[in-house]
Amino acid sequence: MINSRQTLDLKLFAASPGEPVDWRRSDQPVPYPGAVDAMERRAAAIASSEAAEQVWLLEHPPLYTCGTSGREADLVKARFPLFSTGRGGQITYHGPGQRIAYVMLDLKRRRPDVREFIACLEEWIIRTLDAFGVKGERREDRVGVWVARPDKGPGHEDKIAAIGVRLRRWVSFHGVSLNVDPDLSHFADIVPCGVSDPRYGVTSLADLGLRVRLTDIDQALKRTFSEVFGS
C-alpha cells in the first residue's frame, strides 16, 4: 500500500480523453437499498460505455453496512438496520452528518490497480481535509484516513473517513464516507471496520472543533478530486 504523498503518482489515475465525470448530489437521506441499486445500474452503464463516470454525494438514514470481510460479532448492538453489501471492508455506520461519496469510475480508462485506486481515494480525502486545516493521514495496515489525537494519549489516532469499494468489469462503485458532524455515539454499537484496539477511535470535523457545512465539503471534494483524478 502506498503510504506517503511523495510516492503516489497521481498521473496514473488521470482518465484518457472522454466524457467528464458527472457529479450528482442528493439533498435528502437516501435509503441504502435504493442507493446500491442505482450504483449497480450506473456502473453497468459505464462498463458498457452508455454513461459517463459519476461521483454521487449523499447521506443515508442511520444504518450499518457489513462488507465482505465483516463479522457478525462486530455488531455489538443492533440499534439500526444492518445491510450486507458486496463492498470490501468490514462493518461501519452511516447516518446524517456524514458525507458519502460513491465513486463510479472506469479503471480501464485510468489504471486497473485496486490498491493504488484506494490510495488515491485516501489522497482525495487527505487533500479535502487539508482545505479545512485538518491533517489526515493514511496507514499501511489500516485502510481509511486517520487523524492523530495526542490529546487522548500516546499513539492515539481516530478515523475520520472510511473507504470500501467494489469493482465489476473494472468499474468501481461504493466509495468513501467522511465524518462531518454525525452522531458519533452510534459508532459505539459496532467495532468500526473491525478495529478493536482502544488506541484507535472515530472522530469527525465537528468533534475536532470545526463547524463545516456539507455544501462546503462538497465544493472541496469536487476541487480536490480534479487534482487527484484529473477530471
Swiss-Prot record:
Catalytic activity field: octanoyl-[ACP] + L-lysyl-[protein] = N(6)-octanoyl-L-lysyl-[protein] + holo-[ACP] + H(+)
Residue numbers marked as site, Lowers pKa of active site Cys: 159
Entry's Gene Ontology BP terms: protein modification process
Pathway entry: Protein modification; protein lipoylation via endogenous pathway; protein N(6)-(lipoyl)lysine from octanoyl-[acyl-carrier-protein]: step 1/2
BPL/LPL catalytic domain sequence ranges: 49-231
SUPFAM superfamilies: Class II aaRS and biotin synthetases
Active-site residues (renumbered): 193 (acyl-thioester intermediate)
Subcellular location: Cytoplasm
Keywords (A to Z) from UniProt: Acyltransferase, Cytoplasm, Transferase
Main enzyme class: transferase
Family indicated by similarity: Belongs to the LipB family.
NCBIfam families membership: lipB (TIGR00214), PRK14341.1 (NF010921), PRK14345.1 (NF010925)
Function description: Catalyzes the transfer of endogenously produced octanoic acid from octanoyl-acyl-carrier-protein onto the lipoyl domains of lipoate-dependent enzymes. Lipoyl-ACP can also act as a substrate although octanoyl-ACP is likely to be the physiological substrate.
Protein name: Octanoyltransferase
Organism: Nitrobacter winogradskyi (strain ATCC 25391 / DSM 10237 / CIP 104748 / NCIMB 11846 / Nb-255)
Taxonomic path: Bacteria, Pseudomonadati, Pseudomonadota, Alphaproteobacteria, Hyphomicrobiales
